[in-house]
């Protein structure tokens, strides 16, 4: 009898002001397995890492992500860095990092192995290189268009 276990892929990110780059990233991540779970950064984490609060609260970002066909489930992360406890609960087979996320695949892999998590960690490439696919550039265009 064959193994019917689904391959679970986990990604994480802020996903504030959803754009086409996010959609391409989620599509690529979904192609790595059968089930895609997205961890949305907690508002406190966004504020600490980006130096500003998110435009949209985590609950709204999660709801928007749930509406994307590639996404099977969304959870809101805990404040702070990557939660090993959350990763353990999600039981990923693959953790896919975005091209602009500043985590080292090797360092993350080592940290996970120490905790008994054997997920593959990979970095997905940019598929859509454009200022239209960067939240900071979108915010800048909004300010230039409507505030000057």
Curated annotation (Swiss-Prot):
Could you tell me the EC number(s) of this protein? 2.7.7.2
What Pfam families does this protein's entry cite? CTP_transf_like
Q: In which pathway does it act?
A: Cofactor biosynthesis; FAD biosynthesis; FAD from FMN: step 1/1
Residues bound to ATP are: 14-15, 19-22, 100
Q: Which InterPro entries match?
A: Archaeal_FAD_synthase, Cyt_trans-like, FAD_synth_RibL, Rossmann-like_a/b/a_fold
Q: What GO molecular function annotations does the UniProt record carry, in alphabetical order?
A: ATP binding; FMN adenylyltransferase activity
Q: Which SUPFAM superfamilies match?
A: Nucleotidylyl transferase
Q: PANTHER family per the record?
A: FAD SYNTHASE (PTHR43793:SF1)
Its annotated function is as follows:
Catalyzes the transfer of the AMP portion of ATP to flavin mononucleotide (FMN) to produce flavin adenine dinucleotide (FAD) coenzyme.
The record's section on NCBIfam families has:
cyt_tran_rel
Q: How does it assemble?
A: Homodimer.
Membership in a protein family: Belongs to the archaeal FAD synthase family.
What name is this protein filed under? FAD synthase
The species this protein belongs to is: Pyrococcus furiosus (strain ATCC 43587 / DSM 3638 / JCM 8422 / Vc1)
Name of the gene: ribL
């Amino acid at each position: 009898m064959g193994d019917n276990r689904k391959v679970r892929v986990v990604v994480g990110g802020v996903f504030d002001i959803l754009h086409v780059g996010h959609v391409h990233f989620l599509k690529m991540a979904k192609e790595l397995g059968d089930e895609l779970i997205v961890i949305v950064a907690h508002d406190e984490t966004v504020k600490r890492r980006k130096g500003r609060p998110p435009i949209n609260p985590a609950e709204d970002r999660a709801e928007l992500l749930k509406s994307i066909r590639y996404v099977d489930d969304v959870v809101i992360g805990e404040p702070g860095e990557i939660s090993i406890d959350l990763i353990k609960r999600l039981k990923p087979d693959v953790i896919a990092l975005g091209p602009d996320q500043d985590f080292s695949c090797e360092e993350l892999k080592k940290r996970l192995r120490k905790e008994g998590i054997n997920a593959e960690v990979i970095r997905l490439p940019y598929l859509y290189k454009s200022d239209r696919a960067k939240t900071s550039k979108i915010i800048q265009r909004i300010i230039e268009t409507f505030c000057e």
